[in-house]
Amino acid sequence: MGDQRQRSLSTSGDSLYIVLGLDKNASPEDIKKSYRKLALKYHPDKNPDNPEASEKFKEINNAHAILTDATKRNIYDKYGSLGLYVAEQFGEENVNTYFVLSSWWAKALFVFCGVITGCYFCCCLCCCCNCCCGKCKPKPPEGEEQEYYVSPEDLEAQLQSDMEKEGDGAIVVQPTSATETTQLTSDSHPSYHTE
């Protein structure tokens, strides 16, 4: 444990292993035995006049719940109680990702990329503005029609001229409503008729 830095401990400041009186390499059977012994000693029913025993019992239960769950124990062994807090907030499968992204080199990489792209301004230009307002836009393949901008006024004028060419063919009457019924019988073909 000399190469690993000291992690934050339980809420009382003691390691969960110390709460149960165990070594970090304790087996699940050792954890169970120690928990039972301490739970009997500090159970609130056996110590009704001692509120400290009740608090100690809660800590023992918490330590037992974490150390008997293999995933939580692994997280606790690697990252301490901060790892357990992160597991509660983001899920047990995202703990490693959280600590990788919160490392100094990930933050430095993010800052470096921000600096070389002008606070990510270049990325916005490439994605949103098609690089230099379309000047660097890729050319369409041979044989395809080139896209161009048409102003709304030109479109309006074209629509007016098309309507004048077609003549006075405007529809001025609403369609009448129609009802349809279906008769399905087992001995005949379905027939559709309006009433």
Curated annotation (Swiss-Prot):
| Broad class of where this protein is predominantly found | cytoplasm
SMART domains found in the cross-reference section: DnaJ
- Spell out the GO cellular component terms annotated for this protein, sorted alphabetically and separated by semicolons: chromaffin granule membrane; cytosol; melanosome; membrane; plasma membrane; presynapse
Post-translational modification (record): Palmitoylated. Palmitoylation occurs probably in the cysteine-rich domain and regulates DNAJC5 stable membrane attachment.
Residues annotated as region Disordered?
A: 162-195
Q: Name the residue ranges with Polar residues bias.
A: 174-189
PROSITE patterns given for it? Answer: DNAJ_1, DNAJ_2
Q: How does it sit in the membrane?
A: Lipid-anchor
Question: Where is it located?
Answer: Cytoplasm, Cytosol; Membrane; Cytoplasmic vesicle, Secretory vesicle, Chromaffin granule membrane; Melanosome
Q: Does the keyword Chaperone apply?
A: yes
Q: Where is the J domain?
A: 13-82
Record key words, sorted: Cell membrane, Chaperone, Cytoplasm, Cytoplasmic vesicle, Lipoprotein, Membrane, Palmitate
Q: One Pfam match, by short name? A: DnaJ
Q: Which InterPro entries match?
A: DnaJ_C_subfamily_member5, DnaJ_domain, DnaJ_domain_CS, J_dom_sf
Would you indicate the residue range of the signal peptide? Answer: none
Query: In its UniProt record, which GO terms are filed under biological process?
Result: chaperone-mediated protein folding; regulation of synaptic vesicle cycle
Q: What does this protein do?
A: May have an important role in presynaptic function. May be involved in calcium-dependent neurotransmitter release at nerve endings.
Listed name of the protein:
DnaJ homolog subfamily C member 5
Annotated source species:
Tetronarce californica
